[in-house]
Curated annotation (Swiss-Prot):
InterPro entries: KH_dom-like_a/b, KH_dom_type_2, KH_sf_prok-type, Ribosomal_S3_C_sf, Ribosomal_uS3_bac-typ, Ribosomal_uS3_C, Ribosomal_uS3_CS. It comes from Nandina domestica (Heavenly bamboo). The gene is rps3. It is found in: Plastid, Chloroplast. Residues 43-118 form the KH type-2 domain. This is Small ribosomal subunit protein uS3c. Keywords: Chloroplast, Plastid, Ribonucleoprotein, Ribosomal protein, RNA-binding, rRNA-binding. GO terms for cellular component: chloroplast; cytosolic small ribosomal subunit. Belongs to the universal ribosomal protein uS3 family. GO terms for molecular function: rRNA binding; structural constituent of ribosome. PROSITE patterns: KH_TYPE_2, RIBOSOMAL_S3. HAMAP family: Ribosomal_uS3_B (MF_01309_B).
Length: 218
């Protein structure tokens, strides 16, 4: 059988870049990793709690972290920043202070910026959240995937592959179903492919969603 490598790690340095940029002594490296994880979890929890409408889509495509000696710069790429910011001018400041409270670094300043993504449904994370929301509402999985593929086609992508595994539609036996639309050249390193795996908890059990989106070729 073909061995599946993670498409993001496979393309690091060519079409993909690291989401965290910092240097540390080997003995402090694990602390830095845990700090990154805490920052990401804290941001996601805050966004979940403070969404303006309960759309079920957080709309976070990715979180980039850059650390210097005296500053931690966090950039949140969101598809729908209005949900968080609209009507709350102090939304970012609140988020900043709640993250700062979580990890007590006195001598480092934390700076959070939110960047809007032009075509949110061209990003697998946002699309996975959309499909997860549909599956939780007991929409049939084929309908959910078809709707998701329609949304990505509007975002000018060249190809998409969606895979769902688990007790689909509450069936007794777990199975894997996948649908591909357009081209998804996983072996071509210069092909810019975005990937995400997402777990959704339904009343029948956990379902795994994997999405590959082929956006461009360099």
């Amino acid at each position: 059988m073909g061995q599946k490598i993670n498409p993001l790690g496979f393309r690091l340095g060519t079409t993909q870049s690291h989401h965290s940029l910092w240097f540390a002594q080997p003995k402090n490296y694990s602390e830095g990793l845990q700090e990154d994880q805490k920052i990401q979890d804290c941001i996601r929890n805050y966004v979940q709690k403070n969404m303006r409408i309960s759309s079920g889509v957080e709309g976070i495509a990715r979180i980039e972290i850059q650390k210097r000696i005296d500053l931690i710069q966090v950039i949140i790429y969101m598809g729908f920043p209005k949900l968080l910011i609209e009507g709350r001018s102090r939304g970012i400041e609140e988020l900043q202070s709640s993250v700062q409270k979580r990890f007590n670094s006195v001598n480092r300043k934390l700076n959070i910026a939110i960047t809007r993504i032009a075509k949110p449904y061209g990003h697998p994370n946002i699309l996975a959240e959309f499909i997860a929301g549909q599956l939780k509402n007991r929409v049939s999985f084929r309908k959910a995937i078809k709707k998701a593929i329609e949304l990505t086609e509007q975002a000018d992508t060249k190809g998409i592959q969606v895979q769902i595994a688990g007790r689909i539609d509450g069936k007794e036996i777990a199975r894997v179903e996948w649908i591909r639309e357009g081209r998804v050249p996983l072996q071509t390193i210069r092909a810019k492919i975005d990937y995400c795996s997402y777990t959704v908890r339904t009343i029948y059990g956990a379902l795994g969603i994997k999405i590959w989106i082929f956006t461009d070729e360099e």
